Amino acid sequence: MPAPVSSIKIIALAAIGILIVVFAILLAVFHNDLLAIAMPIAERIAKLPMSFLIALVLIAASSIPPLLGQDPLALLIGAVWGLNVGFWTVVCGIFIGETIAFMAYRYFLEQKAQEFREHHEEHYGTFVKIVEEGSYPLIWLIRLSFLPTHFTTVFFATLPELSYIGWAIAFWLSCFKYLVPVYAGYCIVHNKSSAANIVGIVLSIVVTLGTLAFLIVRYKAIKNSTLEDSTNSTSDVLNHLESQPTDSIDLRHLEQTSEQNETDNSERKHLLSHQH
């Protein structure tokens, strides 16, 4: 017997969380190989005037769905442009890119936003309730985690209750999370092994898994509550019908049957009289 759709979706969400963690671990393990490939190109770009603007445009573009690559680019920017310039380049670039995505889906891509709602129709309303319950603290926590922003930004854009200002405040209050990949790139180039970087990665993973677990738990609770309410409503209707007096129902049925029989008999008599 196939698993319920809700269970499949929950398993899918858990799988996404695991993939994010695996990606973060692989990035931490193979960052040297990635930098060895990309560093020569990045160093040539860094020699150009106002080169950080090129990096800003690249990471802004990677923040607009369906393009990818925020974390590797942030790592590279930290390695080439350093901790200070690199961090603000990454944060401003991502903010610009995600602002474009937010505004586009809210005001210019209404059909796409509607398709997004319809594609996730079965579960969209549930997640809206979760966000409404958690309000801005939950929005901030989702922003702070490393859940895919290509999904969360589009989701937030489809919520009329969430203003752009509210979303922007949540972004800036959580932007320090981008220190993790930028500082990792900076440490690699300067041959530093910092405990702070390891702590940052671990905290990011913990926050992401914690947020994902909270969303799954609340999702199941709201789904079960909705199912229970629906069951109770159906039971109330059945109880109401059962409470109706059966005598009056049977009497009406007998009266209708009697009237029908009288009509049939009169028609037969009429036909017989014509035959004679």
Curated annotation (Swiss-Prot):
<feature type="transmembrane region" description="Helical">
    <location>
        <begin position="48"/>
        <end position="68"/>
    </location>
</feature>
<feature type="topological domain" description="Cytoplasmic">
    <location>
        <begin position="31"/>
        <end position="47"/>
    </location>
</feature>
<feature type="topological domain" description="Cytoplasmic">
    <location>
        <begin position="97"/>
        <end position="152"/>
    </location>
</feature>
<feature type="glycosylation site" description="N-linked (GlcNAc...) asparagine">
    <location>
        <position position="191"/>
    </location>
</feature>
<dbReference type="GO" id="GO:0000139">
    <property type="term" value="C:Golgi membrane"/>
</dbReference>
<feature type="region of interest" description="VTT domain">
    <location>
        <begin position="78"/>
        <end position="188"/>
    </location>
</feature>
<dbReference type="GO" id="GO:0005737">
    <property type="term" value="C:cytoplasm"/>
</dbReference>
<protein>
    <recommendedName>
        <fullName>Golgi apparatus membrane protein tvp38</fullName>
    </recommendedName>
</protein>
<keyword id="KW-0333">Golgi apparatus</keyword>
<dbReference type="InterPro" id="IPR032816">
    <property type="entry name" value="VTT_dom"/>
</dbReference>
<dbReference type="Pfam" id="PF09335">
    <property type="entry name" value="VTT_dom"/>
</dbReference>
<dbReference type="GO" id="GO:0016192">
    <property type="term" value="P:vesicle-mediated transport"/>
</dbReference>
<feature type="topological domain" description="Lumenal">
    <location>
        <begin position="69"/>
        <end position="75"/>
    </location>
</feature>
<feature type="transmembrane region" description="Helical">
    <location>
        <begin position="10"/>
        <end position="30"/>
    </location>
</feature>
<comment type="similarity">
    <text>Belongs to the TVP38/TMEM64 family.</text>
</comment>
<feature type="topological domain" description="Lumenal">
    <location>
        <begin position="1"/>
        <end position="9"/>
    </location>
</feature>
<dbReference type="InterPro" id="IPR051076">
    <property type="entry name" value="Golgi_membrane_TVP38/TMEM64"/>
</dbReference>
<keyword id="KW-0472">Membrane</keyword>
<feature type="transmembrane region" description="Helical">
    <location>
        <begin position="153"/>
        <end position="173"/>
    </location>
</feature>
<feature type="transmembrane region" description="Helical">
    <location>
        <begin position="76"/>
        <end position="96"/>
    </location>
</feature>
<feature type="region of interest" description="Disordered">
    <location>
        <begin position="257"/>
        <end position="276"/>
    </location>
</feature>
<keyword id="KW-0325">Glycoprotein</keyword>
<feature type="topological domain" description="Lumenal">
    <location>
        <begin position="174"/>
        <end position="196"/>
    </location>
</feature>
<keyword id="KW-1133">Transmembrane helix</keyword>
<keyword id="KW-0812">Transmembrane</keyword>
<feature type="topological domain" description="Cytoplasmic">
    <location>
        <begin position="218"/>
        <end position="276"/>
    </location>
</feature>
<feature type="transmembrane region" description="Helical">
    <location>
        <begin position="197"/>
        <end position="217"/>
    </location>
</feature>
<comment type="function">
    <text>Golgi membrane protein involved in vesicular trafficking and spindle migration.</text>
</comment>
